[in-house]
Amino acid sequence: GLNVFAEPVRQGDLTLVVESQGEVRPRREIIVAPQISGRISYVSPDFIDGGFINKGQLLVRVEAADYELAVVRAQSTVASAQQALALEEAEAELALQDIEDLGISDASPLARREPQLAGARAALESARAQLKDAQLALDRTAVYAPFAGRVRERNVDIGQVVSVGQSLGQIFANDVVEVALPLKDAEMGRLGLPLAFSSSKAQPGPDVTFRATVGGVEREWHGQVVR
């Protein structure tokens, strides 16, 4: 006869392994560029191809003399505008006193020196705005690293004249990297991932283990599918 064997079903965890390979890319990579023009007066010794940099580290400085002079001029303009406003306020006060003493009830705005006072106030606001612009330009003579990471390449040196937006080099963050892993439809199904998957706190992606040989040494990193 036919022998039939039965095995009780046991509930347990099953690990499905899908293998793939891809290129490691930094999540953040930017071109370092100045927001003002001028001659380079300083370059950090760490700002070299392959160099390590810290967040907030000074990478490059543009000669600041012209921008410092612009700030001094703007400060002088503000001081002059403040003095002019103070004089105009005094003149307006005297004009109002004269109008009151003469008993004039329908004095014109010009007689009350209202246009002159408004003009002096506007001149002061304009001078303050110019000072703010000059100070901002001076601050921008220093170019800092927005994050910690490494330098992919440097395109500038001391003495070089640069313009606004010119590439000084490229840096990338090394805290988080991304790897694009090509998967077949069947492999996506084994992982239980829809085609438009995007991880969230409620639905995190599956864990990923990366292995690579670096300098003859087998290394391993752990990550997670995010999209």
Regions found by a protein language model. Give the residues of each.
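Short, Lys/Arg- and Gly-enriched loop/turn segments at beta-strand edges
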Residues: E63-R73, D175-A180, R219-E220
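Short, surface-exposed secondary-structure boundary micro-motifs
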Residues: L58, A64-A65, S167, A173, ...
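Beta-strand/loop subdomains of soluble extracytoplasmic proteins
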Residues: V17, V176, L183-R227
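Surface-exposed patches in structured soluble domains
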Residues: E23, G51-K55, A137, A142-R190, ...
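N-terminal beta-strand block that forms a small beta-sandwich/beta-barrel module immediately after a flexible targeting
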Residues: G1-P45, Q130-K132, A145, N155, ...
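Short, compositionally biased
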Residues: V72-Q83, L181-M188, V225-V226
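Amphipathic alpha-helical coiled-coil segments and their boundaries
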Residues: V60, Y67, A74, I99, ...
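Extended amphipathic alpha-helical segments
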Residues: L16-E19, S76, S80-A84, E88, ...
